[in-house]
Design a protein with these regions (language model features):
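Conserved AdoMet/S-adenosylmethionine-binding subsite of the radical SAM
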Residues: 55-67, 76-177
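Short, charged low-complexity linear segments at domain edges
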Residues: 1-18
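Canonical Radical SAM [4Fe-4S] cluster-binding loop centered on the CxxxCxxC motif
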Residues: 16-49
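Flexible loop residues that form catalytic
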Residues: 39, 73, 124
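Short, flexible loop segments at the rims of nucleotide/cofactor-binding pockets, characterized by
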Residues: 44-47, 73-74, 96-97
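Conserved alpha-helical substructure of the radical SAM core
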Residues: 37-68
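A secondary-structure boundary/capping signal
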Residues: 23, 71-73, 161
């Protein structure tokens, strides 16, 4: 697991829970407003945290923490994400996944393995402007729709969220999201 950041306690990232937040490196989008740009563009320049050390901290904080938010970057790009989430679940912690939704097959697989308890998906813009706002020419909107439909139907708590940028969004965009 490429872990580039670790917040030991958050009251914001996982609604209703005292949680830790784990930041993974890399992303397949290039949103110009990304708050974690270094995770996306230069993850190798950031300190890489040892997975086992992070798990030890989580284990010590059981009883304080009830969950872990795994965010990025884009966590679904991590080839060993499922193995890592299993280790978190073995600690008795709930898992919230933050995703851009471009890899619906990964989200569905993690759900089917019982590794997710909450999903948050960013909706970047209206379908007409999605590729431009996500910085992803050639973006396949069907992948976004597939993730959104799956998340809505899977039975887990979820949220969809949009970062509003005056220079990139119009009022009409929100009507077609």
């Amino acid at each position: 697991m490429q872990i580039c950041g670790f917040n030991k306690t958050t009251l914001l990232d996982y609604p209703g829970h005292v949680a830790a937040t784990i930041f993974t490196g890399c992303c397949n989008f290039r949103c110009p407003f990304c708050q974690n740009g270094d995770l996306v563009l230069h993850p190798a320049r950031l300190p890489q945290l040892d997975e086992e050390e992070v798990l030890k901290v989580l284990a010590k904080r059981r009883g304080i923490l009830t969950g872990v938010c795994v965010t990025g970057g884009e966590p679904t790009l991590q080839p060993d994400l499922a193995v890592f989430l299993k280790k978190i679940k073995e600690l008795g912690l709930l898992v919230k996944l933050d995703t851009n939704g471009y890899r619906p097959e990964v989200v569905e697989d993690l759900f089917r393995q019982g590794l997710l308890d909450y999903i948050a998906m960013d909706i970047k813009s209206s379908p007409e402007h999605y590729a431009a706002v996500a910085g992803f020419p050639g973006l396949q909107m069907d992948r976004i729709r597939e993730s959104a439909a799956f998340i809505q139907g899977c039975g887990l708590p979820y949220e969809f969220r949009t970062t509003v940028v005056r220079e990139l969004h119009r009022a009409e965009d929100f009507l077609s999201i």
